[in-house]
């Protein structure tokens, strides 16, 4: 016998959608936008680390 909790009752509607697929493209475009933003973030971090992107008063001296 399962224990019924208030949190379980609140989350039950989310679980009832399990296995269903949204019609059409669904949220794929939103995922694509976030992937591009994450890629841009990684490129900026890489450029700062590689000193390709110079920022005022930002030192990339790892020795101290």
From Swiss-Prot:
UniProt-annotated location(s): Plastid, Chloroplast thylakoid membrane
GO cellular component assignments: chloroplast thylakoid membrane; photosystem II
Keyword terms, alphabetized: Chloroplast, Membrane, Photosynthesis, Photosystem II, Plastid, Thylakoid, Transmembrane, Transmembrane helix
GO BP terms, alphabetized: photosynthesis; protein stabilization
Keyword Cell inner membrane: no
Cystines in this chain: none
InterPro entries reported in the protein's UniProt record: PSII_PsbH, PSII_PsbH_sf
Alphabetized GO MF terms: phosphate ion binding
Transmembrane segments: 29-49
Main location: plastid
Gene3D superfamilies tied to this protein: Photosystem II reaction center protein H
Membrane topology field: Single-pass membrane protein
Keyword field contains Chloroplast: yes
Entry function: One of the components of the core complex of photosystem II (PSII), required for its stability and/or assembly. PSII is a light-driven water:plastoquinone oxidoreductase that uses light energy to abstract electrons from H(2)O, generating O(2) and a proton gradient subsequently used for ATP formation. It consists of a core antenna complex that captures photons, and an electron transfer chain that converts photonic excitation into a charge separation.
Family: Belongs to the PsbH family.
Record text on subunit structure and interactions: PSII is composed of 1 copy each of membrane proteins PsbA, PsbB, PsbC, PsbD, PsbE, PsbF, PsbH, PsbI, PsbJ, PsbK, PsbL, PsbM, PsbT, PsbX, PsbY, PsbZ, Psb30/Ycf12, at least 3 peripheral proteins of the oxygen-evolving complex and a large number of cofactors. It forms dimeric complexes.
HAMAP family: PSII_PsbH (MF_00752)
Name under which the protein is recorded: Photosystem II reaction center protein H
Origin species: Cyanidioschyzon merolae (strain NIES-3377 / 10D)
Gene it is expressed from: psbH
